[in-house]
Regions:
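Loop/turn-rich, solvent-exposed surfaces of beta-rich toroidal or solenoidal domains
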Residues: 344-347, 386-497
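Structural motif
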Residues: 135-145, 194-205, 251-258, 295-301, ...
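Sequence/structural signature of beta-propeller modules
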Residues: 7-159, 185-187, 529-532
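Repeated scaffold domains used in trafficking and secretory/extracellular systems
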Residues: 112-122, 160-181, 222-238, 274-285, ...
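Asp-box/WD-like beta-propeller blade repeats and closely related beta-sheet repeat scaffolds
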Residues: 160-177, 194-196, 202-240, 249-251, ...
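Surface-exposed loop and turn segments in beta-propeller and other repeat-based domains
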Residues: 97-103, 154-171, 213-229, 270-275, ...
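Blade-level signature of beta-propeller repeat domains, shared across WD40, Kelch, NHL, RCC1
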Residues: 500-532
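Residue-level detector of Asp-centered blade-edge/turn motifs that repeat once per structural unit
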Residues: 123-125, 182-185, 239-242, 284-286, ...
């Protein structure tokens, strides 16, 4: 396996305009190869065949569209749901368009060797914009969303050759543009390995190339660590009025950058127990910036000169230790917003024996309600929850909010994860007195470590993972009914480690009908066959 990784990582990156190489379908462990050569009696695994096979548990029309209040459109980010890893400034991981229904599915893949795409966004022409990385080198790429052909590429700063000494494995590294966003002018705003913010223009005509239009140097405004450790600017998002970029680093520095002047203000996160770190992306609302550290949830705003002002701080139960399968101790979810400025902030804690989903008031940081998740002693999450605000037939808010959380409590290590099963939907319901009550609506035994996505137009939640019951590793896109929690269908994407998406995110095309996911060897698209 290691030899295969090294060989494939050396693939060239000069394939602009060419048909993409497919994701390799032959990356199996020795025990799997033996099983393929000598299968037990009655067993005939055929993993090398192309994907697209459907296993259906309910009719195509089983799920119905879900009525929801759309998240607000940030005026300085690309159109929802195509601006960043979590689709919008509220980080809801939802889209209005209908997702694929499993009708004669087609599988399209691309690979450049070992490496993948942390985030995929969609420009005004609905082309894919992504940051591709192989653990050391990184590129902004423009891809055709239907063929996955590379149209243009821009090289970003690499990690230094000393990066293995930092102790952060490539599959745990969250810098270098993994969390870039696309702005309203089709510019990718990318935090780089040099602790800068690089603003690069995506061209209307790919022949003119991707080019840098502005850079902001933040290397003096991060936490200073002893060599070889390095702090990383991992997240950057625009303030609602567009005057400033807000950034956060993995070692707990939060700051603002004046878009015009480049002036920088910073604040090191710390509480009574000492310095805090950040391991998850943050959300932006009209009322402030919402960031979770490994100890507390914050709302920030900018002072008159850009200084970071703490509006409120809400501690949560970070648990006794980092749990199996997670990368840090503390909340594992990105911060998400539902409702308007009188709505809620959603995260999870890291409590034992069970974690809780927390619905926190945006206005003052007070806990609205919480609900325990999953089984005792095997309860954890390390990916963003999916959130939505329900609406009535007229489109008006009903005062009901949903969060869908995935269980990532896991044994194993890269590239094999063995998470405990569990997807759970919890609703927070606003009471007449303004309080909230939480209730568990459904639980589904699906396993996964991916960033799931909801299609409101199809009424489906989509996840991507392997089936532990398979004789050799096979990967599936599964669709779960948002209302009942029942699995509607699953489609086989492919087999072997080439199709392993290792905690990657799913992305729905803005027009619907097609889902994309990164893998550790590239990208996979699953779409319904075109009508007619």
């Amino acid at each position: 396996m290691l030899a295969s990784l090294v060989a494939l990582a050396s693939c060239a990156h000069d394939d602009i305009g060419r048909a993409p190489r497919p994701v390799p379908s032959w990356l199996f462990y020795p025990r799997e190869i033996w099983r393929l050569i000598s299968p037990p009696p009655g067993e005939m695994p055929s993993p090398a065949r192309p994907g697209g096979q459907v296993e259906r548990f309910h009719p195509v029309d089983f799920a119905e569209p879900v009525r929801a209040v759309p998240p607000p459109q940030h005026p300085f980010m690309a159109a929802n749901p195509g601006s960043n890893m979590h689709d919008d400034a509220s980080m809801t991981d939802t889209a209005a368009a209908p997702g694929p229904l499993g009708i004669d599915p087609e599988i399209v893949t691309r690979s450049e060797g070992f490496g993948g795409y942390g985030t995929m966004a969609f420009d005004r022409k609905k082309r894919l914009v992504g940051v591709y990385g192989n653990g050391r080198e990184f590129w902004v790429q423009l891809l055709d969303a239907h063929t996955l052909v590379k149209l243009a590429s821009y090289s970003l700063p690499p990690r230094p050759w000393s990066f293995p000494l930092e102790g952060v494995a490539p599959w745990k590294y969250i810098g270098a543009g993994m969390y870039f966003y696309l702005d309203e002018r089709d510019r990718a705003v990318v935090p780089t390995t040099e602790n800068s913010i690089e603003v690069v223009q995506i061209p209307d005509d790919p022949a003119s190339g991707i080019r840098s239009v502005r850079s902001y140097d933040l290397h003096e405004h991060v936490v200073k660590l002893d060599w070889p450790q390095r702090d990383s600017v991992a997240w950057v998002l625009p303030e609602w009025n567009g005057r400033r970029y807000w950034y956060a680093t993995t070692s707990g520095m939060v700051g603002t950058v004046d878009v015009e002047t480049g002036a920088i203000a910073e604040l090191r996160l710390a509480g009574d127990a000492g310095p805090e770190i950040v391991e998850n992306s943050f959300a932006v609302g009209e009322d402030g910036i919402f960031i979770a550290s490994d100890r507390a949830l914050y709302r920030f705003s900018a002072g008159a000169n850009g200084e970071v002002v703490t509006d409120w701080r809400t501690p949560y139960d970070r648990g006794p230790a980092m749990k199996p399968g997670l990368i840090s101790r503390g909340t594992g979810t990105s911060v998400s917003l539902v409702g308007g400025t009188d709505g809620l902030v959603v995260i999870t804690d890291n409590a034992e024996p069970r974690i809780h989903v927390l619905f926190v008031r945006r206005s003052d940081g007070a806990l609205g309600c919480s609900e325990p998740l999953f089984g005792d002693g095997q309860s954890a999450t390390d990916v963003s929850a999916v959130e939505l605000e329900h609406a009535d037939r007229a489109g008006a808010p009903t005062g009901e909010f949903s969060a869908i959380v995935e269980n990532n409590w896991s044994s194993g290590s890269f590239p094999v994860s063995n998470p405990e099963p569990g997807l759970t939907r919890v609703d927070a319901i606003r009471e007449p007195d303004g309080g909230y009550r939480c209730k568990t609506v459904w639980t589904n035994p699906t396993r996964g470590i991916n960033v799931a996505k909801a299609s409101l137009g199809a009424g489906l939640l989509y996840t991507y993972f392997r089936d532990p019951a398979d004789a050799v590793t096979q990967w599936y896109l599964s669709a779960v009914d948002l209302t009942s929690g029942e699995t509607v269908y699953r489609v086989r994407a492919g087999a072997g480690q080439g199709f392993n998406n290792w905690a990657g995110s799913l992305f729905l095309h803005p027009d619907g009908g097609a889902f994309y996911t990164t893998t550790i060897f590239g990208m996979v698209m699953v779409r319904d066959a075109p009508a007619g």
